[in-house]
Amino acid sequence: MGISLSGIGTVGKEQLISSCSNGEPNWSYIPTKGKSSKTHAEFVSEIKELARRAATIANKTEYEYISRQVLGLRAEYLSDVAPDRKQLYEQAKNTIKKQTGNSKCKGCGELSLLDFLEKTEGKSSNFAEKKFALAGGGTLNCPILTTGGYGAEIQYQGVTVLSNLGNGWGYEMTPAELAKKDEFYSIYWSEYNLVKESGSSELREMPDYLNQDRPSFEARA
C-alpha cells in the first residue's frame, strides 16, 4: 500500500494517491458507492473521536497514523454520494482485458488494470486515441505516458473519478463529494479546535502537528 500527494493546492481536486502493492486502487482510502451502513450519528461520533485524538497527539508518528484513519473514515462518509468507482474500475479492467486477445489472462482477477494495459503495447498503434464506453455510464481513456506505456483515466459525468498516470491511483471529487467533504471537515475541525481551546495550558502549549502540516493534511484530506 502506498499513499502520497501530488498537485497540492489544486482547487476542487482530490490529490490523494493510493495504491495497493499489487497495483490495484486502495479502496480503504478511495470513496466508492455503498461502502458503509453507519448512521449519521455514528459517523459524527467517530469523526469527533479522531479529532479529539488528533488534538492531543504527542508526535508526528501518531499524527500520520491518525491522518490515515481520518482518510479512511472520510472515504466511508462520502460513500452515499460517491460514484461507483469500484464498479467502473472493474468494467475498465474487463474492457482492456478483452483488448489483449490473450486467453491466458481470462479469470486472472489478481491482475490490475495497468497489467492488462501493459499487454496491449504494440497491439494497436492508435490505442491511446480510443475512448472506451463503460457499462456504468463512464468512459475510459488510455493516454501514452512520457515514461512509456499507457495510463488510465476513468471519467464519469464530466469528472475524472479515477486515474493512474504512472504514480499510483488518484481521483477527483464530484460536486456532491466536495460538499460532503466540507461537511465532514466542519465536524472534524470544530471538535479539534474545541479540544485545543478548552484544554489545559499544557495541552495548548503542546506542538500542534496538524496545524504545522495543515496545508499538506488538507490537500491530502
Predicted features by range, described:
Residues M1-A221:
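Type III/flagellar secretion export determinants
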